Amino acid sequence: VGFKAGVKEYKLTYYTPTYETKDTDILAAFRVTPQPGVPPEEAGAAVAAESSTGTWITVWTDGLTSLDRYKGRCYHIEPVAGEESQFIAYVAYPLDLFEEGSVTNMFTSIVGNVFGFKALRALRLEDLRIPVAYVKTFQGPPHGIQVERDKLNKYGRPLLGCTIKPKLGLSAKNYGRAVYECLRGGLDFTKDDENVNSQPFMRWRDRFLFCAEALYKAQAETGEIKGHYLNATAGTCEEMMKRAIFARELGVPIVMHDYLTGGFTANTSLAHYCRDNGLLLHIHRAMHAVIDRQKNHGIHFRVLAKALRMSGGDHIHSGTVVGKLEGEREITLGFVDLLRDDFVEKDRSRGIYFTQDWVSLPGVLPVASGGIHVWHMPALTEIFGDDSVLQFGGGTLGHPWGNAPGAVANRVALEACVQARNEGRDLAREGNEIIREASKWSPELAAACEVWKEIKFEFEAMDTL
């Protein structure tokens, strides 16, 4: 057959509704909004083509390879209820298209080019199914949930954290003092804010030293293991590693990284270092809403969460369901399960498009953070369960008596909720009463209850099904 030049419709090659997906394929669910007049099959096929082997024209060198072996295929299209112009296109990618152990390469292939495509008005990657064969090429989280509990010797309850505020402007010594007060009061962790790196008012090395001093002092006084998430994020990978190495030399238990602004390549390098050197790795998702907040365009956070589990991190921020930041309950619980569990069944009511088998990849602790306070404690304990980190920044440091009493209030509230749950009480129904009872014997909690009794952030979540 001679080579026939010319532009042909994508769907002739890339729309294959009879295709049986393989266990080794990476499967993607895209929410596609085509330009008027572009039929769904053509739009779905265009997505498959442009994110795999295709280009806009038949090329001579197509004859030198086997397209059937390497092309992405749009194998199913379904309408979106209530949205005339949108549909879900399912695309299968052969495993050979991807470099082993590289989240960077996976994203460059699947979402790197196709989002600017003219025939589409909007495109959103809703979910990915990562095949076991590909999962096994990743190290994943440095330690995972069980190893973290063993390192910290803390079981049977969520962990408590606090972001040090004001996030910018404190000197290293005053910053360390705030860390000490919070840990001394009963928190497990304190945290650098995501944008605390190494600024003129507080260079990273000074902060690391004062925070290490604070946590050792609090550890000695409370007999509990304490941690402060030292943010190693930096302008270059070399500088990031230098900071992580210094943290290890100080003997602290945990460091932190902003995985989206820092990038997946840097994140995976840091995760490997953390596993080799016994450091836990806390991950902040700064910039995620730029990517995941629009309903019809971008990448859903559940995909970014899966990518983080592959790249590596022991904690990741995942919304609160109840505080000031985005997150609808069922959807949030869907990706929380994808972070923690070994095996997650397909469940469209929770936004999970594919059954995901993580085999033995360690799990990640979800971190609830943002506008939460003691009155939220029963709901958070019920929604997130034991394997989570509950982080109260303003909800600790905003206590009228100061940081340590703020920490005491949170710890008492948490212990009361865990005890009530273990006794079989219904946290959703009796939550306020449980907190009130506990506040009778904790003046710190009583003061916190008074301050936060009426604060709510009431807006509709954008991220609904």
UniProtKB/Swiss-Prot annotation:
The modification N6,N6,N6-trimethyllysine is found at K4. It is an enzyme of class 4 (lyase). The keyword Chloroplast applies. The modification N6-carboxylysine is found at K191. Its EC number is 4.1.1.39. It catalyses: 2 (2R)-3-phosphoglycerate + 2 H(+) = D-ribulose 1,5-bisphosphate + CO2 + H2O; D-ribulose 1,5-bisphosphate + O2 = 2-phosphoglycolate + (2R)-3-phosphoglycerate + 2 H(+). Pfam families: RuBisCO_large, RuBisCO_large_N. The keyword Plastid applies. Its cofactor is Mg(2+). InterPro entries: RuBisCO (IPR033966), RuBisCo_large_chain_AS (IPR020878), RuBisCO_lsu_C (IPR000685), RuBisCO_lsu_C_sf (IPR036376), RuBisCO_lsu_fd_N (IPR017443), RuBisCO_lsu_N_sf (IPR036422), RuBisCO_lsuI (IPR020888). Keywords: Calvin cycle, Carbon dioxide fixation, Chloroplast, Disulfide bond, Lyase, Magnesium, Metal-binding, Methylation, Monooxygenase, Oxidoreductase, Photorespiration, Photosynthesis, Plastid. Binds 1 Mg(2+) ion per subunit. Mg(2+) binds at K191, D193, E194. The disulfide bond which can form in the large chain dimeric partners within the hexadecamer appears to be associated with oxidative stress and protein turnover. RuBisCO catalyzes two reactions: the carboxylation of D-ribulose 1,5-bisphosphate, the primary event in carbon dioxide fixation, as well as the oxidative fragmentation of the pentose substrate in the photorespiration process. Both reactions occur simultaneously and in competition at the same active site. PANTHER family: RIBULOSE BISPHOSPHATE CARBOXYLASE, RIBULOSE BISPHOSPHATE CARBOXYLASE LARGE CHAIN. This is Ribulose bisphosphate carboxylase large chain. It comes from Cornus florida. The lineage of its organism: Eukaryota, Viridiplantae, Streptophyta, Embryophyta, Tracheophyta.
